[in-house]
């Protein structure tokens, strides 16, 4: 049950990222373990990361978001 639930949460996380940050969502990786979403990637837009994190927390079954995203300087 946990695996199926985590897989569904992961699928929803990718959809939320695509809706929130658009094509740049491809720069993020998601892994869900027991309702905890691990997010990794690189972005120059911390505002979009914050918006995406809020949206991820609203996914049913999500207990926690663990952020491993690196914020890089805009060139």
Q: Where on the chain are the PLM-derived regions?
A:
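N-terminal targeting leaders
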Residues: 1-75
